[in-house]
Amino acid sequence: FLLKSQLCYCLFGIELIGAGIHALHEDEIFTVDYCGTNCTKQSNGSWTTCPGNCSCYHEDGKTDGFCLSTEYTDFTQFPNLTSEEMDAATPRPE
C-alpha cells in the first residue's frame, strides 16, 4: 500500500510540474509517463536498468526509484497546418 501511495504522490507531483510548465509556454509540452516498473540501487552503487526509452528517477539517499519516460515537444517548430492537412493526419477508426 505504501508503494502505491508513494507512486500516486510522485506521479501527481510530476503531473503538476508538467502542467506548470505547460501553463508557462503554451507552445511547449513536457510529458512524463510511468513505464510500469521500478528501479533499485544495487550494492555496487549502480541502478537497475529500465526498459525501452525509460530512465530511472530517484530521490537522493533512496534505494528505490521509478522508471519514467520523458518527452519534450516544442510546437513552434511545426508550421501552421491547414484544415485539410489536419484532417489527413487524424487517426481513423478501424
UniProtKB/Swiss-Prot annotation:
Keyword Nucleotidyltransferase attributed: no
Glycosylation sites: 38, 44, 53, 80
Keyword Secreted: yes
Cellular localization per UniProt: Secreted
Cellular component terms (Gene Ontology): extracellular region
UniProt keyword annotations, A-Z: Disulfide bond, Glycoprotein, Secreted
Entry function: Salivary chemokine-binding protein which binds to host chemokines CXCL1, CXCL2, CXCL5 and CXCL8.
Source species of the chain: Ixodes ricinus (Common tick)
Protein name stated in the entry: Evasin P1172
GO molecular function annotations of the record: C-X-C chemokine binding
Disulfide bonds: 35-54, 39-56, 50-67
